[in-house]
Amino acid sequence: MYKKKYPVIIFEGIEASGKSTNINNFSKFLKKNKYQFIKIREPGGTKFSEKLRKIMLSKSNKLDKKTDLLLILASRSENVSKIIYKNYQKKIILIDRFSDSTIAYQHYGMGLNLNIIKNLNSYIIGKFKPDLTSVSYTHLRAHETSYD
């Protein structure tokens, strides 16, 4: 069986599900074992994308849901063109959130059109496909009570 030397791994999960802990622990393992890797997050990644992240997550900005989607996709476009394609098949690429989160939050959470989201995402990522998606689950009841 053919194994990719440098896979692209996406880490998905709702807030407080352990997603960030998982990606950080895996990063430590890779570093300890001297694997070449990069770790990025969405939104974020490039300097420009980190600025977009600040705008999107600022409580003082009440963004329209379409604006929110387009900013996330702008961040992804920057990541794909400036980080992912540059490092593809040269380093292991770890990504904290990607397309699945966009569908979950913007379609199922905000009610935006699924076909529009998928079409825009396909336009941005082109032929790029991640090799593996790791999903961190948590019981919703436990998630709700952790913030009470």
Show which residues each predicted segment covers.
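Extreme N-terminal, non-catalytic leader segments
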Residues: 1-7
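Hydrophobic anchor at the beta1->P-loop junction of P-loop NTPases
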Residues: 11
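Walker A (P-loop) phosphate-binding loop of P-loop NTPases
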Residues: 16
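Conserved lysine of the Walker
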Residues: 19
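Hydrophobic positions on the alpha1 helix immediately C-terminal to the Walker A/P-loop
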Residues: 22
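ATP-dependent small-molecule kinase phosphotransfer cores
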Residues: 35-125
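Short glycine-/polar-rich loops that comprise or flank the Walker A/P-loop
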Residues: 128-132
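Conserved small/polar residues in nucleotide/adenosyl-binding loops
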Residues: 138-145
